[in-house]
Amino acid sequence: MLSDRQLWHAHNFETIVTATLNAYKAGCSPSSLSEELMELAAAQGFADYMVPGFEHGIGMIGDEWRIGMNDGPIPYWTNPDHIYQENEMVICAMQYACPEEDIGFRYENPILITKDGCEYMSKFPLKIEVIE
């Protein structure tokens, strides 16, 4: 049986993933996404459980070229202020962890950045299922 607290954490994670997927679009940056989404997490009381990163590259194509021509402040890391371009692909990757309560979640989904949003490559819906 899940506790109300466990369901609260699960709902938080579902909320932040949905907000993240709705925030991606051409013209925004990893930094602007992080700022917007961490503000949401803080307002709802779960920012302490979020790892404040929301994407990573996908390998030999996608956003990895930015690492090879890095112009950001951290060597070998993607510049957090680069601007997403239409038709760019990244992995929407999120982590939520509350070690003191032995609960955490991870989400990864390849996405295609579009002019006004993003297209998810995974066709599995994000939802909370309680199995008893």
Regions found by a protein language model. Give the residues of each.
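Active-site neighborhoods and metal-handling regions in enzymes and metal-associated proteins
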Residues: M1-E132
